[in-house]
């Protein structure tokens, strides 16, 4: 890759921090200048897609158009089986356009009131898209999935989003109780980024 400045096409501070950390820990990208799109003065893309893939492409293309630089976009969310896959692509705004993480968690827990533990399966999904330019005809698209189940109350202080209510069976704790390194090794975003870095290294 000739251009070592990379735009992270997201306004989500948690995603920016997580992606920056992961990229800095990887030899192939340790020397990249990773800049969130908030460093430029332009509005976020309208996420009009109905899938994570569509929205990630929309965001990556928009960031490339606005900055003239390569971009990585992340579209991700939580799918809860008992809620027919909700909140899905609406995860970040489940409780409304200006919802906080706590607002979204509270709405989720309310929606799952009375649902037995054995029926609270859920999965985090992440789609990462890399585009060299806005006209890139072959964006790199990588996907990750992380299975778990939803707790009845938040546990842990790390992470962001729905992490405090997402139980990670193999670690016997919530996602919000994992270290950054542990989470990177297991998470949907870590899986997708590993695939993306392998593609970029080719």
Swiss-Prot record:
Gene3D superfamilies the UniProt entry points to: 3.90.950.10
Protein origin, superkingdom: Bacteria
Active site positions, chain numbering: 75
Enzyme superclass (EC): hydrolase
Stored InterPro entries: dITP/XTP_pyrophosphatase, ITPase-like_fam, RdgB/HAM1
Cofactor(s) needed for function: Mg(2+)
A GO molecular-function annotation: ITP diphosphatase activity
Cellular component, GO, one term: cytosol
Catalytic reaction annotation: XTP + H2O = XMP + diphosphate + H(+); dITP + H2O = dIMP + diphosphate + H(+); ITP + H2O = IMP + diphosphate + H(+)
HAMAP family: Non_canon_purine_NTPase
Subunit structure: Homodimer.
Similarity comment: Belongs to the HAM1 NTPase family.
Protein name: dITP/XTP pyrophosphatase
Species assigned in the record: Idiomarina loihiensis (strain ATCC BAA-735 / DSM 15497 / L2-TR)
């Amino acid at each position: 890759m000739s251009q070592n400045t990379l735009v992270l096409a997201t306004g989500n501070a948690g995603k920016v921090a997580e992606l920056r950390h992961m990229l800095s820990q990887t030899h192939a990208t340790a020397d990249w200048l990773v800049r969130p799109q908030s460093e430029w003065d332009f509005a976020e893309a309208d996420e009009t897609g109905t899938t994570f893939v569509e929205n990630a492409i929309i965001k990556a293309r928009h960031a490339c158009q606005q900055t003239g630089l390569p971009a990585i976009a992340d579209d991700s969310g939580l799918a809860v089986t008992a809620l027919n896959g909700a909140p899905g692509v609406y995860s970040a705004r489940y409780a409304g356009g200006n919802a906080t993480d706590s607002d979204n968690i509270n709405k989720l827990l309310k929606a799952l009131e009375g649902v037995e533990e054995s029926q609270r399966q859920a999965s985090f999904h992440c789609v990462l898209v890399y585009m060299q330019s806005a006209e890139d005809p072959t964006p790199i698209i990588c996907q990750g999935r992380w299975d778990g189940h939803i707790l009845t109350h938040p546990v842990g202080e790390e992470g962001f989003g729905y992490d405090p209510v997402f139980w990670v069976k193999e670690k016997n704790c919530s996602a919000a109780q994992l270290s950054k390194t542990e989470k990177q090794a297991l998470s949907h975003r870590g899986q997708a980024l590993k695939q993306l870095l392998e593609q970029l290294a080719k």
